[in-house]
Swiss-Prot record:
Protein name: Methionyl-tRNA formyltransferase
Class in the EC hierarchy, top level: transferase
Record's function text: Attaches a formyl group to the free amino group of methionyl-tRNA(fMet). The formyl group appears to play a dual role in the initiator identity of N-formylmethionyl-tRNA by promoting its recognition by IF2 and preventing the misappropriation of this tRNA by the elongation apparatus.
Organism: Baumannia cicadellinicola subsp. Homalodisca coagulata
Binding site for (6S)-5,6,7,8-tetrahydrofolate: 109-112
Phylogenetic classification of the source organism: Bacteria, Pseudomonadati, Pseudomonadota, Gammaproteobacteria, Candidatus Palibaumannia
Length: 311
């Protein structure tokens, strides 16, 4: 089986690695164009491109896909199937007609829940107790195709997007290889999605990561875990951005204005929220490494004063 792989971030690179080390042949890689990144605005290549180059695979980086350039790529390298993981660009329906076996998409949720760009983060953000990997036959919709394979995993109260990515990558590897085997043997079972249960996982943005103290402590703690490793929850004090990497919930309702600093000690900074309080335990200043609150307080003991109200 000759595979054209389409993907961009490290989550996708994991699946490319699985395919490279499988009995199947990866004949080419589609990934997003190199983008300017960082303070120096340097040109950054995707994790998928880096892995492809390491294994001497042809790399295609069109600014956008349409029928003609998609057809050219597939015909040029003779593709049996297109495998898509977090590519980040819409695959035109016409392009799916060119591979002999069509295209499949590996998605990080239990579809039809959390269709869209950020399914792993939105599952944490919403307080879901489980998620999973769904492999679908691609159609002209956004994550709407019929289900070929689905496997679930628990979301633990301590999970972040980082840990959940790792869990899903592990179970997804087995799911991908099993699906390809079923396609080859013609034994796959196709199940249409029930659109009645569909939800949308909109893309994350940095503005969303700013902590809103009006939310409940439970909601804020979930946001902090969901936005790790990006965009990282933050708040401002003394016109300085403080990123929050770890927090705990205090369910007691203190009846203070949300954002009020309730107490400060080496364990954490307790702050009133819309309901309950959040205890911030792990923080980071710009240009420094993340650190326990006690280390921050040792060098800046007057930054957090009980009774003061944060923005």
């Amino acid at each position: 089986m000759r595979i054209l792989f389409a993907g961009t971030p490290s989550f996708a690179a994991h699946y490319l690695s699985v395919l490279i080390n499988s009995p199947y042949k990866v004949v080419g890689v589609l990934t997003q164009p190199d983008r300017a990144a960082g303070r120096g605005n340097y040109l950054a290549t995707s994790a998928v491109k880096q892995l492809a180059i390491k294994h001497n695979l042809p790399v295609f980086q069109p600014e956008y896909l349409h029928e003609n350039n998609g057809k050219h790529i597939i015909e040029h390298i003779s593709v049996d199937i297109l495998v898509v993981v977090a590519y980040g660009m819409i695959i035109p329906q016409d392009m799916l007609m060119f591979p002999k076996l069509g295209g499949i998409n590996i998605h990080g949720s239990l579809l039809p829940r959390w269709r869209g760009a950020a399914p792993i983060q939105r599952a944490l953000w919403a307080g879901d107790i489980k998620t999973g990997i769904t492999i679908i036959q691609m159609d002209d919709g956004l994550d709407t195709g019929p289900i070929l394979y689905q496997v679930a995993c628990k979301i633990l109260p301590v999970d972040t997007s980082t840990t959940l990515y790792a869990k899903l990558a592990k179970i997804g590897s087995t799911a991908l290889l099993a699906t390809l085997k079923q396609i080859i043997t013609g034994s796959q079972v196709i199940e249409p999605q029930n659109n009645k249960f569909a939800t949308y996982a909109r893309k994350l943005n940095k503005k969303e990561a700013r902590i809103d103290w009006q939310l409940t402590a439970n909601q804020l703690e979930r946001c902090i875990r969901a936005f790790n490793p990006w965009p990282i929850s933050f708040f401002k004090i003394r016109d300085t951005i403080i990123k929050v990497w770890g927090a705990q919930i205090d369910d007691i309702n203190y009846h203070h204005i949300p954002g009020t600093i309730l107490s400060v000690d080496p364990v954490g900074i307790k702050i009133a929220t819309g309901k309950g309080a959040i205890i911030i335990t792990q923080i980071q200043l710009a240009g420094t490494k993340q650190m326990p609150v006690k280390d921050f307080l040792n060098s800046r003991p007057t930054w957090f004063i009980p009774g003061n109200i944060l923005e």
